[in-house]
Amino acid sequence: MLSLQTIAKMAVATNTYSKCHYPILKVFGLWWKNNTLNGPIKICNHCNNIMVGEYPMCYNHGMSLDIALIRAVKERNISLVQLFTEWGGNIDYGALCANTPSMQRLCKSLGAKPPKGRMYMDALIHLSDTLNDNDLIRGYEIFDDNSVLDCVNLIRLKIMLTLKARIPLMEQLDQIALKQLLQRYWYAMAVQHNLTTAIHYFNNHIPNIKPFGLRCALYFNDPFKIHDACRTVNMDPNEMMNIACQQDLNFQSIYYCYLLGADINQAMLMSLKYGHLSNMWFCIDLGADAFKEAGVLAEKKNRRVLQHILGLNIFKRELIPPCKDPDPYQIQILLKNYILKNVSTVFTYYCQ
């Protein structure tokens, strides 16, 4: 049951006040000051979001109670930790990022179950497995700059996160800091499952994440996100094509890069190198004709049948009508249920 003081503070925080009331709000404990915030604390009647400063009372502003609580714990702001817990924030999330004995004791006194051992990893996995915008954001806030992860096996953690994200998060295991790895992990999970609220949040809170966002869009075959990312990220079309070819059946990503001027012969060879034959056949449909080089590569990979097929002079090229501009709507309509035409040509040849 909420105390009378808690109810009174919540009632005050649901209203907007002029600057002449600010000294009273500070005394009342409804003020948040740190490196980035300095203003009165408000709580939205509709969504329970916490707002700081001169924001209107409406949806999609501020931060959730849990996020506010997590940040207060990281700042070791005892009064705000108590306030946000009383208002309904989950103190168990705060306990996961309490890095000092005093904050750990405070969280425990407020009802948190002290996390131990694998509970940190279990929480990280759980928050990403729910495939929910709010949980991904909570996971990012809890584990960003969280020293409790210093004690885990870093190589094992990096491998696990990469496998779950289904996209290469780094070129080599020792080339990326844990902080950056986790940021990429949360972002990749959001893009992979089209969690738009989380994507927008990460774009605003993770520095220099947009180039990785373009990589995710290419890898997960999303022409709309590719189109949006290309407005702010300058990447060579051939580099984009290399990323697109790393995942099979990425026809829409490959076609987008092709329209930007990427080398379709190199895309054909890269697709074969990665073992993604559907991508290779799609490149041939687009007009790729690097059959001699592909035959040599197929021989090196001990694909004798494919080597023989690539030596046949039966293929038709430029079977897909080109678009003037890389329009994601046209690309999706054109390729959503695309059937590889030169694969059909091969079947027809051998069935005659």
From Swiss-Prot:
The keyword Phosphoprotein does not apply. Induction: Expressed in the early phase of the viral replicative cycle. GO terms for biological process: taxis. Coiled coil: none annotated. It comes from the Viruses. InterPro entries: ASFV_MGF360 (IPR002595). Keywords: Early protein. Plays a role in virus cell tropism, and may be required for efficient virus replication in macrophages. Belongs to the asfivirus MGF 360 family. This is Protein MGF 360-16R. It comes from African swine fever virus (isolate Warthog/Namibia/Wart80/1980).
